[in-house]
Amino acid sequence: MSIPEMQWAQVAEQKGGPLIYKQIPVPKPGPDEILVKVRYSGVCHTDLHALKGDWPLPVKMPLVGGHEGAGVVVARGDLVTEFEIGDHAGLKWLNGSCLACEFCKQADEPLCPNASLSGYTVDGTFQQYAIGKATHASKLPKNVPLDAVAPVLCAGITVYKGLKESGVRPGQTVAIVGAGGGLGSLALQYAKAMGIRVVAIDGGEEKQAMCEQLGAEAYVDFTKTQDLVADVKAATPEGLGAHAVILLAVAEKPFQQAAEYVRSRGTVVAIGLPAGAFLRAPVFNTVVRMINIKGSYVGNRQDGVEAVDFFARGLIKAPFKTAPLQDLPKIFELMEQGKIAGRYVLEIPE
């Protein structure tokens, strides 16, 4: 398979951008790595944070962002046994980990202190050819469309793991904050596929229509409600609140409200990462109502296998729009304005 020396990529040369669409060298895989010809890459809010450099985590510069890449393996290192040339592969946020520390040994690879992160600490998938550790790349069934599966590689795995972390069971109710966004639209579907009832929280009629079409039993519009806490509780059985809350918002305020409408002995799971934000919960109520508050961060390798399997079996359809790689700056503008329903997937040029 012919591999060129140069390729097109979206490159940030300094924090805050601008993005420059230019040619850069094609990387060569190490002994335990694969080189993937990226056909599609989802766009995640994390990519915008990476560009801005506004998280308390050092970001590589210059940087090729992106961490939801789906494509074809075109080269592999001598030690790679998991992939053959021509296999379909997904490159995710967790590009690699040491596999030897306490966290890796107990299947918490995302917590590895030496983890490498696609599109953040190593170059990601907003380029024609990208590198990933073979042990962490996802093998994709060849009958699965690469454009449609791209958002599952981060958004899907992340929300699937969050639902597992919440402990919510079939027949119980989960409130999903940010249900009309890229993560939320997937969380809603995973929840429905797991037999969980959903109260969707977001803003706007377009997002309401999408959430209802995906199976939400109730929709609370934060731009219209006079009392969000009361409205969410009223939408749950017996008005007692949701058994779990999945926080996918990119603003701080929802993180201050969730403990007020979660059910006693319920669980609040923080997944969204608004820059500089803090969680807030009344200590008295948290104690006497036995509320659990926890974070959930992407997923391990097995979570990835399971999340992709839901998709491969037709249980999940990621709402997405396609755009060329050159349009990434415009997509970031729409993202900052909160005007994206579902997910954007970039088509990477051949």
From Swiss-Prot:
Chief location: cytoplasm
Binding annotation for NAD(+): G178, A179, G180, G181, G182, L183, G184, D202, K207, I271, G272, L273, R343
CDD domains recorded: CAD3
InterPro entries: ADH-like_C, ADH-like_N, ADH_Zn_CS, GroES-like_sf, NAD(P)-bd_dom_sf, PKS_ER
Cystine pairings recorded for this chain: none
Subcellular location: Cytoplasm
Domain of life per record: Eukaryota
Co-factor requirement: Zn(2+)
Pfam family, one: ADH_zinc_N
Entry keywords, A to Z: Cytoplasm, Metal-binding, NAD, Oxidoreductase, Zinc
Record EC number: 1.1.1.1
A GO cellular component annotation in the UniProt record: cytoplasm
Top-level enzyme category: oxidoreductase
Residues that bind Zn(2+) 1: C44, H67, C154
Molecular function in Gene Ontology: alcohol dehydrogenase (NAD+) activity; zinc ion binding
Positions contributing to Zn(2+) 2 binding: C98, C101, C104, C112
Family per similarity comment: Belongs to the zinc-containing alcohol dehydrogenase family.
Subunit structure: Homotetramer.
The protein's name: Alcohol dehydrogenase 1
Organism: Aspergillus flavus (strain ATCC 200026 / FGSC A1120 / IAM 13836 / NRRL 3357 / JCM 12722 / SRRC 167)
